[in-house]
Amino acid sequence: MSETALLVVDVQNDVMAESVNSDDVVAKISSLVDRAREQGVPVFWVQHSDPGMPRDSDAWQVVPQLVPAPGEPVVHKTWGDAFVETDLAERLQERDVKRIVLCGAQTDACIRSTFYGGIHRGYDMTL
């Protein structure tokens, strides 16, 4: 089993609609997801919700170019850091993950918060 996991954060319709070069970003993330799956690296998905992007709304959905495969964990968060008030750490521990390759949307917000949250919890983080 791989000690590395790919963590895909907030690549959702509403978030990507406001992103610069979103088509390029999604294509690069799609390539990472494909390579992770080919190499047996677990892929974890994170979706953010808040009053402006309610859970289960169209805005909240992962962009159609990126679809979590059956069995890939999806973590729902309401804070910038995907570790805060979620079961992400427990799910990673269940798979003995020690290294996280982090990608997604809003590098200045949720990616940065999750990056530091992972470091704080002892993970080897790659952005």
Mark where each language-model region is:
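Active-site acidic carboxylates
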Residues: 1-77, 89-90, 94, 98
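Ser/Thr-centric signal marking residues that sit
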Residues: 4, 107, 114, 126
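Short glycine-rich anion-binding loops that position phosphate/pyrophosphate groups of nucleotides
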Residues: 14, 80, 106-108
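Hydrophobic beta-strand scaffold residues
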Residues: 43, 125-127
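Conserved, mostly hydrophobic/aromatic
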Residues: 75, 102, 118
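Short, well-ordered alpha-helical microsegments
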Residues: 84-85, 110-112
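Active-site neighborhoods of divalent-metal-dependent phosphate/nucleic-acid chemistry enzymes
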Residues: 93-109
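Short Gly/Thr/Asp-enriched flexible loops that form oxyanion-binding sites at enzyme active sites
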Residues: 111-121
